[in-house]
């Protein structure tokens, strides 16, 4: 009898008669030479709870040296490598996910946070967080750091740079992403590139060392945009792949140089299209057992991509919002606490 064709990815189809099979909490690997099968199936990495905060949800985190700074609810916590948790004094405004960045100021770096209510600054030496404001900045919606500069973006399409390893901004040190009148969702740094991401275009900038105004010059424009502010990941330090994002055409795309190559299939494209509030799409990354993973979570579902293998799997164990809260599957506890976890291979 013919061998059973086991799936190597997730392709459920619209109805059972067209399904290509599904991998749930599992990945397919090519077997070593001489094995009885060309493919082996392994479970995906799990989660181990490591610390608990007193707030309801983790909104964002940033590693500064060996200390992790976590925004949870309206509080900020520092977590050491031995999982000692310290609550910083002060609060963070806004709601929902935040973006965070640090510079290379010596001996103590600056850390800035952008949230829906404005900006905040972490004082590492003082173990505190407070409102950050600069009269030269409008209302901003994201932050990143590249080549010594904080870069913040505004929905209007403006991007501002800070002083070199400083938190001061000048109204003239800015540029406008004007290849398309789509505004800006995010600024991210990928290698030596600054990428300004609008709803219908990506603009790549390179550091030209301009002595006045914006230090970066635009180099490449890609006519594909970002569907939602938090639907992009892969630019994080140490991630062994490249930037992957949900595009404005409801596909998942992987940057190969300046080419955003689609990597999602029709099933996931339909799932993305059905999301009524794109802000619920959250992407994140992790690495385990030598594999790099990119995860997209929507309302009630998560899908994992292994970019190097070109395969995907469905992660059914995550509760709604797991990508944003980093809560372990099935985590228990009172509603007033939030648990954070690390991957286990």
Regions found by a protein language model. Give the residues of each.
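A broadly used, surface-exposed interaction patch
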Residues: 79-113
């Amino acid at each position: 009898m013919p061998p059973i064709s086991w799936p190597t990815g997730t392709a459920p189809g619209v109805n059972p008669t067209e399904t290509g099979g599904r991998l749930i909490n599992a990945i397919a690997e090519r077997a070593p030479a001489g094995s009885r099968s060309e493919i082996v199936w392994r479970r995906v990495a799990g989660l181990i709870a490591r610390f608990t905060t007193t707030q309801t949800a983790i909104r964002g985190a940033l590693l500064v040296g060996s200390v992790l700074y976590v925004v949870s609810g309206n509080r900020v916590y520092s977590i050491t490598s031995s999982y000692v948790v310290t609550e910083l004094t002060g609060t963070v405004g806004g709601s929902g996910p935040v973006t965070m960045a640090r510079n290379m100021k010596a001996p103590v770096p600056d850390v800035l946070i952008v949230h829906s209510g404005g900006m905040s600054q972490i004082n590492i030496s003082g173990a505190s967080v407070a409102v950050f404001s600069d009269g030269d900045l409008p209302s901003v919606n994201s932050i990143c750091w590249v080549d010594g500069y904080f870069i913040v973006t505004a929905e209007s399409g403006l991007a501002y740079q800070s002083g070199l390893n400083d938190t001061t901004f000048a109204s003239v040190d800015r540029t406008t992403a004007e290849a398309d009148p789509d505004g800006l969702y995010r600024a991210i740094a990928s290698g030596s590139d600054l990428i300004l991401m609008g709803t219908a275009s990506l603009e790549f900038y390179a550091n030209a060392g301009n002595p006045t105004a914006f230090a970066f010059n635009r180099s490449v424009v890609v006519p594909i945009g970002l569907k939602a502010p938090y639907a992009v990941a892969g630019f994080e330090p140490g991630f062994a792949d490249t930037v992957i994002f949900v595009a404005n055409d409801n596909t998942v795309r992987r940057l190969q140089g300046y080419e955003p190559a689609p990597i999602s299939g029709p099933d996931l494209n339909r799932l993305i299209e059905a999301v009524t509030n794109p802000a619920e799409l959250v992407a994140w990354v992790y690495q385990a057992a030598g594999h790099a993973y990119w995860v997209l979570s929507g309302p009630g579902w998560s899908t994992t991509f292994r970019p190097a293998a070109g395969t995907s799997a469905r992660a059914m164990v995550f509760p709604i919002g797991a990508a944003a809260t980093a809560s372990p599957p099935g985590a228990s506890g009172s509603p007033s606490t939030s648990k954070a976890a690390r991957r286990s291979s």
